[in-house]
Design a protein with these regions (language model features):
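Active-site-proximal flexible loops/turns
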Residues: 31, 62, 172-175, 207
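Short acidic (Asp/Glu) and glycine-rich catalytic loops that position anionic groups and cofactors
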Residues: 31-38, 168, 220-226
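Metal-dependent nuclease catalytic regions and adjoining charged, substrate-binding loops involved
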Residues: 203-297
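Metal-dependent nuclease catalytic cores that hydrolyze phosphodiester bonds in DNA/RNA
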Residues: 1-154, 295
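Short glycine/proline-enriched coil/turn segments at helix->beta-strand junctions
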Residues: 130, 159-162, 207-211
Length: 297
């Protein structure tokens, strides 16, 4: 177990992550406070939860669910059984109640299309690896020489010196029609990764040396993006992206050090974006944010 620097301990900041580097600084600080002082996390939404379910079904179908590098893969599950188990998990999700029914509506729509998307994911993983054996998701660590805590990472699938991350895009709502009904827009699989996705891949590449890949899945199919069709996933570009990630980690590190163990000092160093916070996390989290940022006064 690594030793946490003294200045980080009051904030419960024991590690960095790839996702943490792509998160706005104010939300990162808010997340630390909620976890350390309130024992809470940001509320979930139907969209990311549905993505987890798609991956869970794909994992079971390929025999890499609940993966352990010690015991290795298990027997692949029949697709129908995998879908059934995955959908049972999704039934436990409770939609948000503060967005005028948006999350509830999306939850019910996603229930209709998860099985189809999971099949696309299974097919895409199979195409990416072919006969190559691969591992499922488990906790890994990376130590950057300029950062005084390790980086925790979870790669979706790795094998044969290559890794691929599953990225799901779900339908979005169109405006209500005059008769009160609504249609949905079904996106095509992406052909280019977002800057945040490139940063995440850069961390994985730096930590493991695995060639990065992204498997984009929608209800319409899948598309695989890697260095063969995307310059942003080639080594020179990944190195540039990694340096951006490192710089963001350093910003957080310097802020925590400058705060001298006091939340009030930390809040005074960071300007909150209340509009982004309420839009992403709802009025309850906004109320917490407004309360804690008063501590800097």
């Amino acid at each position: 177990m690594h030793e946490i620097p003294v200045y980080r301990q009051p904030f419960g900041s024991s590690h960095t992550s790839a996702s943490g580097a792509t998160q706005p600084v104010d939300e990162h600080i808010l997340k630390l406070y909620m976890r350390k002082e309130l024992g809470r996390s940001f509320p979930f939404a139907a969209r990311p939860r549905a993505g987890q379910i798609v991956q869970s079904i794909a994992d079971m179908a390929h025999g890499v669910h609940d993966y352990s590098p010690i015991s290795g893969p298990t027997k692949p599950m029949d697709m129908a059984d995998a879908v059934r188990k995955g959908m049972n998990k999704f039934e436990f999700y409770k939609p948000r109640d503060w967005d005028n029914g948006k999350d509830t509506e999306e939850y019910h729509k996603f229930k209709e299309i998860i099985p189809e998307m999971a099949q696309h994911a299974v097919n895409g993983i199979r195409e990416f690896y072919g006969d190559t054996k691969f591992e499922g998701e488990f906790q890994r660590w990376h130590q950057d020489e300029l950062i005084d805590v390790p980086t925790m990472l979870f790669q979706d699938y790795t094998g044969g010196g290559r890794q691929v991350d599953l990225k799901c895009s779900f339908p979005t709502r169109n405006p209500l029609k005059k008769d009160g009904t609504r249609s949905w827009r079904f996106p095509k699989p992406r052909t280019e990764p977002t800057p945040q996705q490139i940063m995440q891949q850069a961390v994985y590449w730096k930590a493991t040396g695995d060639e990065p890949g992204l498997l984009f899945v929608t209800p319409l199919g899948f598309n695989i993006v890697d260095a063969s069709n995307c310059d942003a996933l080639k080594p020179h570009a990944l190195e540039e992206s990694y340096q951006q990630v490192r710089q963001r980690w350093l910003v957080i590190q310097n802020l925590l050090r400058a705060a001298e163990g006091k939340w009030s000092n930390l809040f005074a160093l960071v300007q909150p974006d209340y509009g982004q916070i309420v839009g992403r996390h709802g009025p309850d989290i906004l109320a917490i944010a407004k309360q804690i940022w008063r501590l800097d006064r």
